[in-house]
Regions:
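Acidic/glycine-rich C-terminal interaction modules and beta/coil loop segments
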Residues: 1-113
Length: 113
């Protein structure tokens, strides 16, 4: 049997269409969070990141997708944490060229090619 309603990912997944975009994930630094190379990340740029959110950030000339750890903000830095023990956290302080690009709200996987 098939679903009676058609799927509309724009309607079903995107709350802020003007500020939402997608990007294809490259790399394996978030595999323990279930985000794998080739997945599609749906990113909402209108959201302020909260501690523990998965974000896309621009760090010193490169994009990365990581958990954001804001618990060290009073000490003057934040950390971007991978979900793969083979990688180290990224320590961000005032000397870094850092910008939160958006908050990951969904990921989409392709299971069959």
């Amino acid at each position: 049997d098939y679903l009676h309603d058609s799927l509309d990912f724009n309607r079903d997944l995107i709350k802020n269409p003007e500020a939402t975009f997608y990007g294809r994930v490259s790399g394996d630094s978030m595999i323990e969070a279930g985000i794998c190379d080739g997945d599609i990340a749906v990113i909402d740029r209108s959201l302020q990141p909260s501690d523990g959110d998965i974000i896309v950030a621009f760090v010193n000339g490169e994009f990365t997708i990581k958990y954001i750890d804001l618990s060290h903000k009073p000490e003057g830095y934040i950390e971007l944490r991978p979900a793969n023990h083979a990688y180290s956290p990224i320590h961000i302080d005032a000397d870094d060229n850092f910008r939160v690009w958006g908050v990951v709200v969904w990921t989409i996987k392709q299971w069959r090619r």
